[in-house]
């Protein structure tokens, strides 16, 4: 899909000083083209460079149109142009249909696993990065678990889980199976994340993307706590598309392959 900014004419100066979280409302999907996977991957091979593709999976309450706009914002914020690939699963796109979206996500996990395996086959070992936000991060973990069972020899690049809406304890149990198939695994967490706080109430257990979990139990995973950053969105859940600091950190991780100890702007607070 092709996304562009609205032409606001005389109101353009107001748009320039609007809060960062308003940027999404200034974007519109201009064009959607259907292409076969071979054509898409051929084009990606020409533009991705040495790093290979970065596959992004969106979260809950994200219909196709909103997904296009959010994907465009993440691509821009993390400087992933040329290597960005968006996996769109059939979210109902309605706030009241959270459990419907959970079912839709689970239905899509085998296809996501197939996509990851095909990308690694096409681009090679450690060349494919995988990014998941919110409920989409849960889908990434479940897909990686399936990939590890089907292809224990596979080797991916960096896995980044942004505000993951997943049970912390379930992730800890699945980690030993999925951690060996990725070059690195990074989880971004924050306090004040309202959707994750609500998800905790719904499920009864702490979410992986909330700060305050005993992260020493998930050794091998680098945990980036963003709680001290300014809140760039009303919900505290969309820092990956609205926070320039998070965008810079993702660029250093995904484009430059730097571990947390090598990236600027981070302060070590524990072993992981």
Model-inferred region functions:
Residues 59-61, 102:
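Flexible, glycine/proline-enriched loop segments at strand-loop-helix junctions
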Residues 112, 132-136, 140:
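Gly/Ala-rich beta-loop-alpha elbow adjacent to hydrolase catalytic centers
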Residues 51-59:
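Short beta-strand element of the alpha/beta-hydrolase
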Residues 57-58, 133, 162-164:
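Short His-Asn-centered micro-motif
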Residues 62-67:
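Short substrate-entry loop that stabilizes the transition state in hydrolases
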Residues 1-48, 68-72, 76-127, 144-158, ...:
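Lipolytic serine-hydrolase domain surface
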């Amino acid at each position: 899909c092709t996304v562009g900014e609205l032409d606001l004419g005389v109101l353009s100066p107001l748009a320039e000083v609007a809060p960062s979280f308003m940027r999404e409302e200034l974007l519109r999907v201009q064009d959607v083209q259907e292409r076969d996977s071979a054509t898409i991957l051929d084009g990606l091979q020409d533009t991705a460079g040495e790093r290979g593709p970065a596959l992004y999976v969106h979260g809950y309450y994200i219909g196709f149109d909103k997904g296009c706009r959010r994907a465009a914002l993440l691509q821009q914020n993390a400087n992933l142009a040329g290597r960005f690939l968006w996996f769109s699963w059939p979210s109902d796109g309605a706030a009241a249909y959270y459990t419907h979206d959970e079912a839709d996500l689970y239905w899509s996990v085998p296809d996501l696993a197939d996509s990851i395996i095909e990308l690694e086959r096409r681009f090679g070992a450690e060349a494919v990065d995988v990014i998941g936000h919110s409920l989409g991060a849960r889908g990434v973990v479940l897909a990686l678990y399936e990939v590890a069972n089907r292809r224990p020899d596979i080797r991916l690049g960096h896995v980044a889980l942004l505000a993951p809406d997943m049970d912390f304890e379930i992730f800890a149990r699945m980690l030993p199976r999925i951690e060996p198939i990725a070059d690195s695994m990074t989880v971004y967490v924050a306090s004040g994340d309202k959707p994750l706080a609500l998800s905790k109430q719904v499920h009864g257990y702490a979410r992986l993307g909330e700060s305050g979990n005993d992260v020493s139990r998930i050794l091998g995973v680098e945990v980036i706590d963003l709680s001290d950053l300014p809140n760039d969105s009303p919900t505290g859940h969309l820092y990956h598309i609205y926070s320039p600091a998070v965008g810079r950190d993702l660029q250093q991780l995904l484009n430059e392959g730097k571990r947390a100890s090598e990236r600027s702007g981070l302060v070590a607070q524990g072993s992981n």
